[in-house]
Amino acid sequence: MRGDGIRARKALGQNFLTDRSVLSRIAALVSAGAGERILEIGPGKGALTSYLAEQAGQLVAVELDDRLVPLLRGSFAGNPSVTIIEGDILDLDLRETLGRYGTPPWKVAANLPYNISTPVLFRLLDARDLFSRLVLMLQKEVGNRLAAGPGSKEYGVLSVLFQLHFDVTREILVRPGSFHPVPKVDSVVLLFVPLAQPRVDVGDEDYFRRVVKASFAMRRKTLWNCLKGGALGVPTDGIRDVLARCGIDEGRRGETLSLQEFASLTKGLLAAGGSL
């Protein structure tokens, strides 16, 4: 991989995973059997792709870097089960694109650069019915937020929205020396297993997202200060009444609320006339 003359592009947040032990463990987490389908986001130079291609009945890899696409296509030219797509994962209609290559469920493997991790995560969240598992490598800071529980400093919007629909577990801590070039921070591999049903009933998911995002908009402010002002379609006095009916102290902060409490708050606000 280092002898191909292709340097990592800082603008794309590229750090190529070279540690074979970690690559093998990630492939084992993906755990695709014969006939199963894998979407790989950002295959880079194809290190993980090689492991995944040994498992999958169909592997679709989406790569943005136009320097790497010919390298990948050349490496896997003899494997009809591997398709390399040149493009930005954020520009693709996942449902339409994957539909060309087979029916769900798909498994996902990705090494997500920090600068695009959040938008890609939301794309995967919104297309969750296509997937049976996600194995994602992220900067440790982002990974910790996704797996965090109430009361921790990492707990936030990502924690709540993903844990509504997935079991999220931290699986592999990846040190900087496992990459080339060497990054300055640790990474973590997370496993996301979709739930058959949302963990709790939230009433209206679009409105639920609004409530959660508003609750974390000013982390040092109380829920009352975050939610008042009418942006959620409920007058200021109505917000106070809803919090009281839900048994949630208005002086608490968003990071202390459990998923169930966010669901109760959302349904209470909807009942009080809340709207998008």
Swiss-Prot record:
The keyword DNA-binding does not apply. Its EC number is 2.1.1.182. Keywords: Cytoplasm, Methyltransferase, RNA-binding, rRNA processing, S-adenosyl-L-methionine, Transferase. GO terms for biological process: rRNA methylation. SUPFAM superfamilies: S-adenosyl-L-methionine-dependent methyltransferases. It comes from the Bacteria. Pfam families: RrnaAD. It is found in: Cytoplasm. PROSITE patterns: RRNA_A_DIMETH, SAM_RNA_A_N6_MT. S-adenosyl-L-methionine binds at residues 15, 17, 42, 63, 88, 111. InterPro entries: KsgA/Erm, rRNA_Ade_diMease-like_C, rRNA_Ade_Mease_Trfase_CS, rRNA_Ade_methylase_Trfase_N, rRNA_adenine_dimethylase, SAM-dependent_MTases_sf. It catalyses: adenosine(1518)/adenosine(1519) in 16S rRNA + 4 S-adenosyl-L-methionine = N(6)-dimethyladenosine(1518)/N(6)-dimethyladenosine(1519) in 16S rRNA + 4 S-adenosyl-L-homocysteine + 4 H(+). Signal peptide: none annotated. Gene3D superfamilies: Ribosomal RNA adenine dimethylase-like, domain 2 (1.10.8.100), Vaccinia Virus protein VP39 (3.40.50.150). Belongs to the class I-like SAM-binding methyltransferase superfamily. rRNA adenine N(6)-methyltransferase family. RsmA subfamily. PANTHER family: DIMETHYLADENOSINE TRANSFERASE (PTHR11727), DIMETHYLADENOSINE TRANSFERASE-RELATED (PTHR11727:SF7). Specifically dimethylates two adjacent adenosines (A1518 and A1519) in the loop of a conserved hairpin near the 3'-end of 16S rRNA in the 30S particle. May play a critical role in biogenesis of 30S subunits. This is Ribosomal RNA small subunit methyltransferase A. It comes from Geobacter sulfurreducens (strain ATCC 51573 / DSM 12127 / PCA). The gene is rsmA.
